[in-house]
Design a protein with these regions (language model features):
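Fungi-biased detector of serine/threonine-rich
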Residues: 64-65
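N-terminal "cap/leader" segments of large eukaryotic alpha-helical scaffolds
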Residues: 2-35
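Alpha-helical repeat scaffolds
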Residues: 106, 192-195
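Structural detector for internal amphipathic alpha-helices that build alpha-solenoid repeat scaffolds
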Residues: 16-20, 31-34, 41-61, 73-98, ...
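C-terminal end-of-chain micro-motif
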Residues: 1-2, 202-203
Length: 203
């Protein structure tokens, strides 16, 4: 569990961001760190919300920025603490987030660390937990890996989900691309018929 001394030890910006977290969010991180240290499961009693998502995302960004500095003040012990807190924070976000922006942050982080197992885990979370509109947003990302993970997830979506997205002026073209992939890669006749009907309507 991070004591105030430990957090202060990690740098001024980290201490500031930590102090700005709601007590409930700080408690979530503390319990996750304790669970990681003891090998136990964390409690699910905390009501995770969009604000906790944003707070943890900012905290993780501060931790990763500090780790990237590699200054003389960052000795081996402090670096180890920094990595432990950052990895724990990333794990909590990975388990809880449904935000496209946070997902992209986690993928970029795993990519920089060459942690391909974590990227696979994130891809699984994308298909099992994220709303279709968030996946579409990721499919338009400038990050190649994020974009490909999202397009792959959409290509495995049920036709009914993609059909609903066709009514959204922002997501419609992304949904069409997913339907085309279903035709080409999976030989989906249902997707083929839907695309043909769309083409007929537009003639």
């Amino acid at each position: 569990m991070p004591s105030p001394f430990m957090i202060d030890d990690l740098g001024d910006r980290i201490a500031t961001v930590w102090s700005e977290l709601r007590p409930a969010t700080r408690g979530l991180v503390e319990r996750a760190l304790q669970a990681a240290a003891t090998g136990t499961q964390t409690s699910r009693s905390f009501q995770y919300d969009a604000r906790a998502d944003l707070e943890l995302s900012r905290f993780l960004a501060a931790l990763d920025d500090r780790a990237a500095e590699k200054t003389a003040a960052l000795d081996a012990e402090t670096g180890g603490k920094l990595k432990s807190v950052a990895d724990t924070c990333a794990s909590v976000l990975q388990e809880q987030t449904e935000s496209a922006e946070v997902f992209a942050q986690l993928v970029r982080r795993a990519e920089m660390q060459k942690d391909y197992k974590r990227i696979d885990t994130l891809a699984d979370a994308l298909t099992s937990r994220f709303p279709p509109s968030e996946i579409c947003e990721l499919a338009r990302s400038e990050d190649v890996i994020v974009r490909e993970l999202a397009n792959e997830a959409l290509a495995r979506c049920p036709i009914s989900v993609l059909a609903a997205l066709l009514n959204d002026p922002v997501d419609a073209e992304t949904a069409r691309y997913a339907l085309r992939r279903q035709v080409v890669e999976y030989g989906s006749e249902e997707a083929r018929r839907l695309l043909a009907a769309l083409d007929q309507e537009e003639m």
